[in-house]
Amino acid sequence: MQLLTIGINHHTAPVALRERVAFPLEQIKPALETFKSIWLGPSARTAPEAAILSTCNRTELYCATDDQAAREAAIQWLSRYHNLPIDELAPHVYALPQSEAVRHAFRVASGLDSMVLGETQIVGQMKDAVRTASEAGALGTYLNQLFQRTFAVAKEVRSTTEIGAQSVSMAAAAVRLAQRIFDKVSNQRVLFIGAGEMIELCATHFAAQQPRELVVANRTAERGTRLAERFNGRAIPLSELPSRMHEFDIIVSCTASTLPIIGLGAVERAVKARRHRPIFMVDLAVPRDIEPEVGQLEDVFLYTVDDLGAIVREGNASRQAAVAQAEAIIETRVQNFMQWLDARSIVPVIRHMHTQADVLRRAEVERAQKMLARGDDPAAVLEALSQSLTNKLIHGPTHALNRASSENRDKLIELMSGFYKHSGSTER
């Protein structure tokens, strides 16, 4: 089996492309079924394994398959599934085989590949991806072991290095941007759209600035109200958004919608009603919640996850020593995993050898039983059994030696000498 990771992320693709290859949570299980099917056929020796990780910053397919054309097949499947021309997608895709796939998984879970260096949210997202793949019956020995090791490495990196210390989160970066536009956030009205983990983090950071008003708009009223009350704010129905948008100076949105929920026309009306007082908008969703054309309006300052990434990276340089330490840990663990993987590769060979030897053994035992049944001398039967079994067991190695070239024969002799050194002693 070969490990392979196919994907795009914030390093290789802009948000405009990432949002087009994102997988909503409810689509992942059926997507895994169709994805695995590309490798299910008469030539497949082992059932393929797969998991899909889809976040704001990355969409990745983790695979274990014996298909030699897995890379091309996976990229073509991703292109077809999202109705994207292959020539538009392929330049942004990375394909990482074997040790590169292992190293990548370890780095992602450890926060080394994140926009926010050392952030911990990705671990929970990876665990969700693994849980979903397991529920879909898409995991097996190889990916199960990969992800178990991945989470162990992530824990080791975070507990033995300072990789997460003093990190600038996306939420903190949003506040910093707001402070560049408004003298005081405390004078502004802030609207949060959504009630998930990212909005909760943003609300925590903005609430610390004591804004004039804090409001939450969410599709589920109860959840929106619960979040708003935590910060002494209030909640409004999402349906009121178009008519109430002009009331807010700062709007932060992060929902799971597959289509924009804030269009150009609605923002144009809000700007007009505000008499061109500026609106600061942060769109943390992928796919995006706010139509990108909104950013072209005067008096509107629209930022996406990629824009916030530039601010986040300003704080990453100071932690390069921790990065080097984390990379060293990861490299050691990659080598350990590859040793396990190499050992797994010979399991089918060993199993086949045992099966073949057992077939020979059964045939000889059956032959000996027939000889005993007709009254042959037991000692002679045992001698015949041992001689015949010995001849058949060494027939394969002997045949290989006789047919090998002189160069290969020397290697075989050396290997077989080692085999028989470990075959056991006749002493009791």
UniProtKB/Swiss-Prot annotation:
The keyword NADP applies. PROSITE patterns: GLUTR. It catalyses: (S)-4-amino-5-oxopentanoate + tRNA(Glu) + NADP(+) = L-glutamyl-tRNA(Glu) + NADPH + H(+). It is an enzyme of class 1 (oxidoreductase). The record marks 104 as: Important for activity. It comes from the Bacteria. The keyword Signal does not apply. GO terms for biological process: protoporphyrinogen IX biosynthetic process from glutamate. Its EC number is 1.2.1.70. Keywords: NADP, Oxidoreductase, Porphyrin biosynthesis. One of its GO terms (molecular function) is NADP binding. Substrate binds at residues 55-58, 114, 119-121, 125. Pathway: Porphyrin-containing compound metabolism; protoporphyrin-IX biosynthesis; 5-aminolevulinate from L-glutamyl-tRNA(Glu): step 1/2. The active site is at residue 56. NADP(+) binds at residues 194-199. InterPro entries: 4pyrrol_synth_GluRdtase (IPR000343), 4pyrrol_synth_GluRdtase_dimer (IPR015896), 4pyrrol_synth_GluRdtase_N (IPR015895), GluRdtase_CS (IPR018214), GluRdtase_dimer_dom_sf (IPR036453), GluRdtase_N_sf (IPR036343), NAD(P)-bd_dom_sf (IPR036291), Shikm_DH/Glu-tRNA_Rdtase (IPR006151). Homodimer. Catalyzes the NADPH-dependent reduction of glutamyl-tRNA(Glu) to glutamate 1-semialdehyde (GSA). Possesses an unusual extended V-shaped dimeric structure with each monomer consisting of three distinct domains arranged along a curved 'spinal' alpha-helix. The N-terminal catalytic domain specifically recognizes the glutamate moiety of the substrate. The second domain is the NADPH-binding domain, and the third C-terminal domain is responsible for dimerization. NCBIfam families: hemA. Belongs to the glutamyl-tRNA reductase family. During catalysis, the active site Cys acts as a nucleophile attacking the alpha-carbonyl group of tRNA-bound glutamate with the formation of a thioester intermediate between enzyme and glutamate, and the concomitant release of tRNA(Glu). The thioester intermediate is finally reduced by direct hydride transfer from NADPH, to form the product GSA. This is Glutamyl-tRNA reductase. It comes from Paraburkholderia phytofirmans (strain DSM 17436 / LMG 22146 / PsJN).
